[in-house]
């Protein structure tokens, strides 16, 4: 998976769509979640540098009081992203849902995933298994979050079970909602793959 993961923005290839994987903005203690902060900053960097034209914000919206896509949208607009370049996926309950829905609902088969490196590995594993072309922009991770890394260990086993044993699909699919392509010029090197 290493050839598909980019740690440096300047090395990241252009793709029309960047998919920001959701997480809570705050911990239960009320402290800002650094994973969230780094993902938002990574999305702003990719967008502002012209590496992506649209940001698909995929996250959990299970409760009226908890809405990851809308929270990300507000912060990205505050950061200067044009609201017309933001698409919301309210059914990104888990990584498998976010990746597969990007292909099957938002009609995008070649995109940049924006998340931390450890999460990139699982997201790309799912994408490649499903025949989806994706690359990942690996944003920084907080250094002292052992509980998240422990959770990731379990999530990887869950992903293997979902793909190979249960053959799970996203919880919700729905009608096709293509992300617009006509508003932006596509650079000449848009089809370069690692």
Pin down the residues of each PLM region.
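N-terminal membrane-anchoring alpha-helices
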Residues: 1-15, 171-178, 182, 187-193
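Low-complexity, compositionally biased segments
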Residues: 10, 78, 100, 155, ...
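A transmembrane-helix-recognition feature enriched in membrane-embedded lipid enzymes
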Residues: 146-172
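A structural signal for short, hydrophobic/glycine-enriched beta-strand patches
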Residues: 1-150
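A general structural signal for short secondary-structure boundary/capping elements
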Residues: 62-67, 135, 158-164, 181-186
């Amino acid at each position: 998976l290493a050839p598909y993961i980019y740690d440096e923005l300047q090395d990241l290839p252009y793709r029309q769509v960047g998919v920001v994987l959701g997480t809570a903005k705050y911990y239960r203690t009320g402290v800002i979640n650094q994973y969230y902060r780094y993902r938002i900053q990574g999305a702003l960097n990719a967008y502002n540098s012209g590496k992506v034209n649209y940001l698909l914000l995929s996250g959990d919206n299970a409760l009226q009081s908890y809405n990851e896509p809308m929270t990300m949208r507000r912060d990205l607009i505050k950061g200067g992203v044009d609201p017309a370049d933001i698409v919301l996926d309210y059914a990104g309950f888990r990584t498998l849902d976010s990746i597969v829905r990007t292909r099957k609902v938002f009609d995008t088969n070649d995109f940049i995933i924006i998340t931390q490196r450890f999460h990139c590995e699982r997201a790309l594993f799912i994408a490649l298994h499903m025949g989806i072309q994706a690359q990942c922009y690996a944003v920084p991770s907080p250094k002292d979050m052992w509980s998240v890394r422990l959770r990731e260990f379990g999530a990887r086993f869950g992903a293997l079970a979902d793909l190979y044993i249960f053959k799970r699909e996203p919880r919700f699919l729905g009608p096709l909602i293509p992300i617009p392509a006509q508003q932006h010029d596509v650079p000449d090197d848009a089809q370069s793959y690692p």
